[in-house]
């Protein structure tokens, strides 16, 4: 049996994780010096509502390698022969390192994989291989599909402000300050572990139009999730406005606080897998 592990930055809804037997390790947010588990100790809605008024900026932290080791041990006790542990890019997070440190205790029975993606750009990779694993597919078949989905996954988002990116140190203070004064709506894409700038728009309305254009350019899609940070109405309106062929069972997801801490509330975007 091949077991699948990921972490909460994958944004896989609980019901899908349960359906496809995916084990998810929660990540950590530090609020006023107190560590809380993403999606467990505080809801995402509450977190994003509080974020603009927090006097001290919250920080993100990686779950300990001990949490991963405990998860791996439980899965082996339940009969797993091999574990695939799929995580956010090592260049963006310490999650990959924590999982890798834990995996050393189990030799080649645990494979830790850099997805090159975040949120459901990673989550769709995990879901694809979890379905195959339940069907009893071979490790080689599963790894081949994982690489295929990885190459076709895209995550693009419009931020409502540069303020939270500036706090995180992802851009220079001057650039973030100017962007905030001009009310720019920056666009970013995550691909192969890199965060790429796709420019900006002056207004949210134009930004949503541009986001739609970026999605259309990708062509036929296999999977689609509309991502937001406490902007569910905008996310659902965006989904309903699409005139392209929308894949079956699209998701609308309020993304992980670990990512949203650095992007801020009212963000809007999408994760997709381009049809092969």
What are these regions (language model features)?
Residues 3, 9-23, 27-28, 91, ...:
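Mixed-charge interfacial surface used for oligomerization/domain docking
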Residues 1-2, 80:
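Local beta-strand N-terminus motif with an aromatic residue
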Residues 49-54, 72-73, 130-132, 273-274:
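A general structural signal for short secondary-structure boundary/capping elements
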Residues 3-62, 67:
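N-terminal glycine-rich anion-binding loop in soluble enzyme alpha/beta folds
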Residues 43-47, 78, 100-105:
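A short glycine/small-residue-enriched secondary-structure motif
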Residues 55-56, 62-93, 97-98, 143:
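Glycine-rich phosphate- or other oxyanion-binding loops that anchor nucleotides, phosphorylated ligands
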Residues 51-54, 75, 149, 218:
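Alpha-helix boundary/capping residues
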